[in-house]
Amino acid sequence: MIKIRLKRYGKKNRPTYRIVLIESQKPRDSKTIEELGHYDPLLKQANFKFDEIMKRVGQGARLTSRVRYILKQFS
């Protein structure tokens, strides 16, 4: 199953996340299929390709609860 979820990067105690399309059984920081945006929780900023995310959801990708929350908050 393909999921749209967060991939952590950044520094210790200073996380930033990429919103990525990835196989659900792979580890969080493994190779992704596609990068769809990014999210900075400390600055409360998010940039993402909303049209591309909706296209992938239409093709059967599932959103994690955290990504769904980010999309609702910043759309």
Curated annotation (Swiss-Prot):
One of its GO terms (cellular component) is mitochondrion. GO terms for biological process: mitochondrial translation. InterPro entries: Ribosomal_bS16, Ribosomal_bS16_CS, Ribosomal_bS16_dom_sf. Keywords: Chloroplast, Plastid, Ribonucleoprotein, Ribosomal protein. GO terms for molecular function: structural constituent of ribosome. It is found in: Plastid, Chloroplast. Belongs to the bacterial ribosomal protein bS16 family. This is Small ribosomal subunit protein bS16c. It comes from Cyanidium caldarium (Red alga). The lineage of its organism: Eukaryota, Rhodophyta, Bangiophyceae, Cyanidiales, Cyanidiaceae. The gene is rps16.
